[in-house]
């Protein structure tokens, strides 16, 4: 019984030591002389050891190549924020997958709390640049209804997804009217 009590107290102490930390990043991506529109960007917190990496936020660049991401997590130690870009700029059509660029973000922009109080402006990046330690992403999780990556929207099929959802809502309305 005493061992269980000690374990419970230790777990409560560990939980209390966890602190909310957050970060935000914004910028603009180019592909040559023009904006890199609909480029997938993600904000990660990378962990070492058995603790899995945490996806803090994700999205796509707008028509001007601009993005803004922010997110946070509870960690015992300071977070290691990383910004990732997945793109096909200046890429051979024969190569599979997308180019993956990973940039570490300055720890000075980490703030306490669930909402970031400071935003790191990464500036303008031209994706024609070959970055050090650049990788390729060969597998991409696609949208599954209500499952993992349910918020994933493929920009190439966004019009199809929107028309499908409007058709589904029209079918539901027709069903309601029938009964």
Swiss-Prot record:
Keywords from the named record: Secreted, Signal
Biased composition (Basic and acidic residues): 157-179
Region span, Disordered: 144-179
Organism superkingdom: Eukaryota
Protein name (record): Transthyretin-like protein 46
Species of the source: Caenorhabditis elegans
The family this protein is said to belong to: Belongs to the nematode transthyretin-like family.
Signal peptide: 1-17
Predominant cellular place of this UniProt entry's protein: secreted
Compartments it resides in: Secreted
One Pfam family named in its UniProt record: TTR-52
Gene Ontology cellular-component annotations: cell surface; extracellular region
């Amino acid at each position: 019984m005493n061992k269980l009590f000690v374990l419970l107290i230790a777990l409560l102490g560990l939980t209390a030591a966890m602190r909310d930390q957050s970060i935000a990043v914004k910028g603009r991506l180019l592909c040559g002389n023009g904006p890199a529109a609909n480029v997938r960007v993600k904000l990660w917190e990378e962990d070492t050891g058995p603790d899995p990496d945490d996806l803090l936020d994700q999205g796509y660049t707008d028509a001007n190549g601009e993005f803004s991401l922010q997110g946070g997590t509870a960690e015992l130690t300071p977070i290691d924020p990383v910004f990732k870009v997945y793109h096909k700029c200046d890429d051979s059509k024969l190569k599979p997958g997308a180019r993956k660029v990973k940039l570490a973000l300055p720890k000075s922009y980490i703030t306490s709390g669930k909402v970031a109080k400071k935003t790191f402006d990464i500036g303008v990046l031209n994706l024609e640049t070959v970055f050090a330690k650049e990788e390729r992403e060969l597998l991409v999780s696609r949208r599954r209804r209500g499952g993992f990556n349910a918020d994933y929207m493929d920009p190439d099929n966004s019009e199809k997804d929107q028309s499908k959802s409007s058709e589904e809502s029209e079918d539901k309305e027709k069903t309601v009217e029938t009964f």
